Amino acid sequence: MQKKTLSDITIQGKRVLMRVDFNVPLDGNGEITDDKRIVEALPSIRKVLDNGGRLILMSHLGRPKGKVNPDFSLTPVALRLSELIDTPVIMAGDCIGTEVMQQALALQDGEVLLLENLRFHPEEEANDPEFSRELASLGEIYVNDAFGTAHRAHASTEGITHFVQTAVAGYLIEKELMYLGKALQSPERPFVAILGGSKISGKIDVIDNLFSKVDTVLVGGAMVFTFFKAQGLETGRSLVEDNKTELALELLAKAKSMGVRLILPEDVMAAPEISPDAPFHAVSVDQLAENEMGVDIGPKTAETYRKEILGAKTVLWNGPMGVFEIDNFAGGTIAVAEALAAATAKGATTIIGGGDSAAAVAKAGLADKMTHISTGGGASLEFLEGKELPGIAALNG
């Protein structure tokens, strides 16, 4: 998927309208608790400013439901960004309108204007053409660097491209496409995918798409219990999708017919309930008691998975191995993260598919030990499902 990028265009003296993902977490006092998403946009931002562009940034924050809500203002982001780039950031009062247009036209080379939250307008998520046209009129060049919203056809990601001549990818999107795209198109082998999370239904399209690309699939998370139920094992009080047992059997058969090794846990951690104080112990998957639930993969499985990961040249991880938010049930997830870090050190390409997996890697303190951590949970999932992302399809090829 070759797309033109920031490196392909002339920026000097031009108004560059850039869609970024500044959807950062705020605490009760409106302070940013994690500025990772702002930091990730810096390479593209610096490229525009260093090359004498006039930068207009736009983003959403939270879910204000199409109404102005001061709790979701991007003002804290403007303050943090100005600290990071050591340049004043002008904060607009809105994202469209006469006043904003005047601010955009008044920008000098190397100056930055941050538009107010796009989702204060219902037209943003509705991909309204008139709203898209108004946004587009602010800039001369459009750059999308918000991979996290690339799977949404919104005004600022898709609609806007109908009203601009130049629409290119920023460096963050370029990096995402490079790593995720290479993994799916020409991976170094062996290629191992680790899939976790609670439901088969949420991962069915990913599993299906990956079967034609990977050598091995390691399964963890609560979705393993739907497989076990399908195989006639006791699953106790574990989370099971009863209406997906046939599907689980079909997936096992399909893996076999396609020559993919689909590996399920041999042991799990069992507990009477999901609580930090609950007693827990390892049991073989055929020994789970009726009054217990599986909350993590067991130590034998963690060791098997570690060996598989260390033998791989490309590893893709999407979804935790257990209820990792509770320390006692995070062992399997941490073990996988540690194995990925070791594989990376050995020269493997390791890709973390955003969302919970990224949080798990951060919890293990190993974020800087992976080849690539995707910034888009939903977007990376849809990309792995083989779907076209509207925000990327809309850019100039």
Swiss-Prot record:
Binding site for substrate: D21, F22, N23, R37, H60, L61, G62, R63, R119, R152
Gene3D superfamilies per record: Phosphoglycerate kinase, N-terminal domain
Family annotation (CDD domains): Phosphoglycerate_kinase (cd00318)
PROSITE patterns referenced in this protein's UniProt entry, alphabetically: PGLYCERATE_KINASE (PS00111)
SS bond partners: none
A GO MF label: ATP binding
InterPro entries, alphabetized: Phosphoglycerate_kinase, Phosphoglycerate_kinase_CS, Phosphoglycerate_kinase_N, Phosphoglycerate_kinase_sf
Residues annotated as binding ATP: K203, G294, E325, G354, G355, D356, S357
EC number: 2.7.2.3
Annotated Gene Ontology cellular component terms: cytosol
Reactions catalysed, as given in the entry: (2R)-3-phosphoglycerate + ATP = (2R)-3-phospho-glyceroyl phosphate + ADP
Keyword Acyltransferase: no
Record keywords, A-Z: ATP-binding, Cytoplasm, Glycolysis, Kinase, Nucleotide-binding, Transferase
Biological or metabolic pathway of the protein: Carbohydrate degradation; glycolysis; pyruvate from D-glyceraldehyde 3-phosphate: step 2/5
GO biological process, one term: glycolytic process
Subunit composition and interactions: Monomer.
Protein's UniProt name: Phosphoglycerate kinase
